[in-house]
Amino acid sequence: MIHRNLSEVQTRLVKFGIVCLGTVLIAVAPTPEGLSLAGKYTLATMFFAGSLWVTGTLPLPVTALSIPVLLTATGVYDDMDTALVGFADHLIFLFMAGFMLANALQKYDIDRRIALYTMAKMGSSPRRLIGAVMLSTAGLSMWVSNTATTAMMTPIAVGVLSQVLSSESVAAVGDSAPEGTASGTATDGGIGTADDFTNMQIGMLLGTAYAASIGGVGTIIGTPPNAVLVGQLNAILGYEIGFAEWLLIGLPVVFVTLPLVWYLLTYVLYPPQIDNVDEAQEQAQAYLDEEDSLDPRGRRVAIIFTATAGLWVLGGLGTFLSAYLPDVWMTTLFGGSGMTIFGLEGHQGILYYVMVGVMAIPALVLADTMEWDELVDIDWGTLLLFGGGIALADALADTGTTEWIANTVFSDLTGMPVVLIIATVVLVVVFLTEMTSNTATTTILAPILIGLGSVFAATLGLTEFKTAIFLSVSGAIAASFAFALPVATPPNAIVYGSGYIKQSHMLRTGVILNIVMTAVLTGLIWLLFTFVWPHLLW
């Protein structure tokens, strides 16, 4: 154990040394034409952080904390106060509120009840049962982190599978053939089915992971890449996508891709050859019956969550309500430069989605549902990663580095058809995400994709501003559609780590789905870009 740990430390130090050497070489090299000295140092910082993120040499949040240090040490920023501004970005507080709301849902098992209810009511056939698991997972993943959702749903799925296959037949990696189970049960059609793994098991568990990733696309707080993009658009372009606006981006993607992945898993790749799932449906109902009815505190959490989600959506409907509300109330509720009911001019709006989210935290405490030590038990590392990414995005924009990268690397690609541009962005993002986390990929690529606005504006027939939004949104969506390797997304890692899926199952299935989803996302994004987003987002 000591030798192995020593070897790991040595490997980490070697990787870190190589990254530092590359960073120094960029910093001391002659400044490229069209790039300022500050831009060169920012480029070196981007190389340093990006390399550490991709290689996993250091934990992602630790690398994020190094960004403001390097930016200040090299003189890109005069002081740490300026370099640390990204760590106080409003979206960090939105995600913090989302994490805390999710903690409250989990404390009272509200998320588990929703999942079990869906499975008990929908799971009348093998395919419908898998669909119920995927629908529950995707729906919860819009509001609870996809990591927490998958961690909760995986044991539920295994428990339900044990009733379908008999508990001895839920194969784990390394198991021999279950006693009394013919090996033929594992070869009931489909592709890549190992002897001990039935199609039902593979389809349900992979469906759980993939549904969590897809569902996260639906809302800003559903998955970190969404918030990373929104934060960097605000940092670089000063453009803000609200909670309701993101629903117009994410929900169509979820509504199209989730049923398609379910169909491919259950009809094409792993069609279940089991007729009767009554016991599984009964098991889901039994799990649900074991849950006591929600106590008053749990009901108050449900009310607060529902009210928060409703106000998030309502906050994006100001344009539609302007004809029915006095100007003073429009400014107070939805923001603007006019007079408010408080007698002051200019207001962000009480229904601003970050304000609504943050106010849910004291509401949980006042309702006597959560203690502070329960609220703060959240993923602070992800919040630090957001801060580092926004700090880097600010520096890339302030020094003109994103525009320089876009013009230098991608200028020869102008004139490509729109569909080919989208396909290239989606394919590159999916490929990179398979090698590193989707959060790290988005943090690295979002500033570059935003910078491509100046390169492809004429090709797309849009302004540079709109082109930057379009390309970067496409990339952020694609970051949630890497299905082949455990490292790509937290849901993939959790399902693989459960021991009930082999990496070969995920790899073969994921490669096929990656190819299909690249084509589907390309067409879907083009349709949204052509007929929806221009009328609703800009």
Which stretches of residues belong to each language-model region?
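Hydrophobic transmembrane alpha-helices of multi-pass small-molecule transporters
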Residues: 1-94, 235-238, 245-407, 422, ...
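Alpha-helical transmembrane segments of multi-pass membrane proteins
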Residues: 127-139, 166-215, 241-248, 418-431, ...
